[in-house]
Each structure stands twice: as structure tokens, then as C-alpha cells.
Design a protein with these regions (language model features):
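Accessory recognition modules or surfaces
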Residues: 4-20, 37, 51-93
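Terminal, regulation- and interaction-focused segments at domain boundaries
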Residues: 6-39, 98-122, 132-135
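Generic hydrophobic, helix-prone segments enriched in Leu/Val/Ile
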Residues: 23, 93, 159-160
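Short glycine-rich, low-complexity/disordered patches
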Residues: 28-56, 134-151
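Hydrophobic transmembrane alpha-helix bundles
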Residues: 36, 69-78, 174-187
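Long, charged/polar, surface-exposed segments that mediate recognition or autoinhibition
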Residues: 73-151
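Glycine-rich, aromatic-bearing surface loops/beta-hairpins
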Residues: 133-193
């Protein structure tokens, strides 16, 4: 009888505040990759070298391949992959960037690849203390919220997206094992000005 009552138990609520705080701490220094790396390390994230066939490694490799196809002159700036358990959630932070003619862009992404649902808009609004723009992500059941400026002044954009578990992504993303919640902070510097 105990097993049956355990099966009926409500799932634990998603630890949104803790995960959002981890994202803010990890990604607040994204203007400079070394600063972002120091921030994640100081916050207790572990530098991580995933197996090549792991979901996070495939996501990163696919992103780099897509950028190189879009512009063969792009220089990929690698800031590393980091891992941390936050309130029982396994999170990955990916710090990266690209350098193109006249533009340097840095990005910090925190992935919760097993998140079962999107964060409620009200919770995101309360946390960010401002309204996001809601943008379609073209994925049934998915969501995408964007803030401009981003996580803090000086950041270009902040985005929080959700992809339902088991989703097959459309081209050109087909084959990328992306699911769950992705928290993104980005900065852009125009070097030709």
C-alpha cells in the first residue's frame, strides 16, 4: 500500500528561485569570458568535460557547426562547460562566444535538460522585475521569453526558453538532443566603431 501512495504523491515543485539565482550568478559577468569563468568557478560550478555522445556535448558541437556553416570566417571562443547540482537539479553552464568581422558576442547558457515544464510567466516577471517579450520558438508546447536589455545593464539580451521532453526539433536543429529549460545571457561588442 505504501508504494501506491508514493505513486500518487505530487511531484516536487520546480526550484525556480534557486535555479534562476544560479543562472544570474553564473552568467552576470558574460561581457568577458575570463570573468564569466571566474564567476562560475567561485559559485561552485565544476569544470566539466562531457563524453562526446552526451546531450550537452552534442548541443555545444551542433551550435558550433551551425555557426561555422552560417559564416566560415567565424572564430569560436570557447569558455568551457560547467556542471552543478542546484536544489536537486543537474545544471550545465556553457560559456562561449563568436568573433566576426567587427563584432564580438559572448553567451552564457544554463541548461536544465530534464526540466519537465516551462517556468510560469508570472514567476519570470517577478524574478526579472520587468515584463519580457514573448516570442514564438516554433516548437509545439515550447516557450521563449526575451528581455532587452539582458540580465543586467550592458548585456544585449536575456532569454529563457523551454523545449518539451522528447521533442524532435525542426531543421536546421533536427538531431540536437535539446529539451528542458535553457537560460541565456548575451553581450555584444562592436569592435569597428
Amino acid at each position: 500500500m505504501a508504494a501506491a501512495s508514493e505513486d500518487l504523491a505530487e511531484p516536487e515543485p520546480y526550484p525556480a528561485r534557486e535555479v534562476l539565482a544560479a543562472f544570474a550568478t553564473a552568467c552576470s559577468g558574460i561581457e568577458e569570458i575570463p570573468v564569466a569563468q571566474a564567476s562560475v568557478q567561485a559559485a561552485g560550478w565544476e569544470h566539466y568535460s562531457p563524453a562526446a555522445d552526451s546531450a550537452i556535448a552534442r548541443i555545444v558541437a551542433s551550435g558550433e557547426e551551425l555557426m561555422a556553416k552560417e559564416d566560415p570566417t567565424v572564430q569560436i571562443l570557447d569558455g568551457g562547460i560547467w556542471r552543478k547540482s542546484v536544489a536537486g537539479r543537474e545544471l550545465f553552464t556553457v560559456i562561449s562566444g563568436v568573433e566576426l568581422e567587427g563584432v564580438v558576442s559572448h553567451g552564457c547558457r544554463v541548461y536544465d535538460l530534464s526540466a519537465p515544464a516551462a517556468l510560469p510567466l508570472e514567476e519570470l516577471r517577478d524574478w526579472a522585475v520587468r515584463d519580457p517579450a514573448e516570442r514564438p520558438n516554433g516548437i509545439p508546447g515550447g516557450s521563449k521569453f526575451v528581455w532587452n536589455p539582458g540580465l543586467k545593464p550592458g548585456h544585449m539580451e536575456m532569454e529563457i526558453s523551454f523545449v518539451p521532453q522528447g521533442t524532435v526539433l525542426p531543421e536546421p536543429l533536427a538531431g540536437i538532443p535539446l529539451s528542458g529549460i535553457v537560460f541565456t545571457a548575451s553581450s555584444v561588442e562592436f569592435t569597428d566603431l
